[in-house]
A protein has these predicted regions:
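Class I SAM-dependent methyltransferase core
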Residues: 46
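A short SAM/SAH-binding and catalytic strip from SAM-dependent methyltransferases
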Residues: 104-119
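A short acidic, Gly/Pro-enriched loop at the edge of an enzyme's catalytic core
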Residues: 96-106
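GHKL-family ATP-binding catalytic core of two-component histidine kinases
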Residues: 97-99, 116, 173
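Class I (Rossmann-like) S-adenosyl-L-methionine-dependent methyltransferase catalytic domain
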Residues: 1-40, 50-95, 122, 138-204
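A short glycine-rich, Lys/Arg-flanked "PGG" loop and its adjoining helix->strand segment in the class I
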Residues: 121-133
Length: 204
């Protein structure tokens, strides 16, 4: 497992500083309204939350959220811009500081596609460990068809996993989805197109 991630953290700190304002979210979680409402009384775990777009979406709708990231700048941005937020420093490359069988719902939005095979497997096992029986992970990852955001660009280090100059990124096909997310349990997946305000979004 590659644990030398100082450069990766620095990159995300810089990215978060450039976007240290109230985050702008899209409405992808609207599709999962029933799942969210069934967790109205539970704390939702926002894994790799960045500056808190999904955190803001959830808090505005009355949900209790723990926002987790390994960028202190991202966590600071959440604390500064989202009232009633709770944050936790968490490095996904290490064991999560969470007890087994804690969460009924975990959200990992565009945060699981930056890691090599070994690390990705580790992360999926950790997610499985902290999920309760019949718990749910809602996640979005980059697709092999995501050509606007780097699919197939750079040095291919592993199948569908590229070094793009400043960082690494994995682009998933359905085989990858089943390989990795299947570690957690049964998988439901679809490929969709995201709509973003490009003024609010910067790579990676």
């Amino acid at each position: 497992m590659n644990t030398n991630n100082n450069g990766f953290v620095k990159m995300w700190d810089n990215w978060s500083k450039r976007r240290s304002s109230v985050p702008v979210y899209d409405l992808w979680l609207d599709e999962y309204k029933e799942i969210l409402e069934s967790n109205k009384d539970n704390e939702i775990f926002d894994l790799g939350c960045g500056i808190g777009a999904d955190t803001l979406y959830l808090i505005e709708r009355g949900y209790n959220v723990l926002s987790c990231d390994f960028s202190n700048e991202a966590l600071k941005s959440i604390q500064d811009n989202i009232p009633n937020s709770k944050t936790l420093y968490l490095d996904m490359m290490k064991k999560f500081p969470i007890k087994d069988n804690t969460y009924s719902l975990i959200i990992a939005d565009l945060s699981l596609h930056y890691f090599d095979n070994e690390t990705t497997i580790h992360i999926m096992r950790e997610i499985k460990r902290i999920l309760k029986n019949n718990g749910i992970l809602l996640s979005r990852v980059a697709s092999v068809n995501d050509f606007n955001f780097g699919a197939g660009v750079g040095e291919e280090l592993e199948r569908n996993y590229y070094f793009e100059g400043d960082y690494t990124k994995r682009f998933f096909d359905f085989e990858d989805i089943n390989k990795y997310f299947g570690i957690i349990g049964s998988v439901e997946a679809e490929e969709t197109q995201m709509t973003r305000n490009e003024d609010e979004y910067l790579k990676p």
